[in-house]
Amino acid sequence: VYISPIRHAEGLLYLNAVLEKPELYEQMLSVLKDYDEDIISINYDNVNVTGRGVYKILSKSHKKALPLNVYGDGMKKAVLLMSAVIAAEDGVLLIDEFETAIHTSAMKNTFRWILETCRKLNVQVFVTSHSKEAIDKLLKCSEKCLDDMALYTLYKKENMTAVRRMNGRKAIEAQDNMGLELR
């Protein structure tokens, strides 16, 4: 499964995979409370003027369920990423610029859920980013996933591009204690 930096804006999701796994669905709703604290559920409504179905979010804040596309990009991106994890079970998930559209206040819980669920569902995930803040949140969101992480940075050495590989713990140490900027 591949997720581009703007895929959340295109409305293409993997929610059917989520709706078939009640435990993960409930966990996902819990994380989505960082985006809308009043969220109750997400469901598929196949009755639409265009003949196509839409995903709707029921929230205590609104009198009726609203289409996901009226929510902010952060909510859409979080739903996309979490549903993609489940759709990629026993496979590979590629996420380019994983942090786009996600507010920094919601990153920790969202990233923790993604990493821990990838581990549980046997999903190998590759993420790219240029955001120091997002990389820091990713590294520090789940202690139990640190040893499973590998972080690669590129740098110049004698007019050539070299690669540095570190596990999650070494990356945090390099960043916090040696001032290495990881992005």
What are these regions (language model features)?
Residues 100-104:
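ABC ATPase nucleotide-binding domain "signature" loop
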Residues 117-121:
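Helix C-cap/helix->beta junction micro-motif
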Residues 89-91, 122-126:
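Loop/turn-to-beta-strand initiation segments
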Residues 135-146:
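Short regulatory helix/loop adjacent to the ATP-binding pocket of P-loop NTPases
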Residues 1-80, 86, 92, 149-150, ...:
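Phosphate-coordinating catalytic segments in nucleotide- and nucleic-acid-processing enzymes
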Residues 96-98:
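Walker B catalytic acidic pair
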Residues 128-130:
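H-loop/switch region of ABC-family ATPase nucleotide-binding domains
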Residues 110-114:
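Conserved hydrophobic alpha-helix in the ABC-type ATPase nucleotide-binding domain
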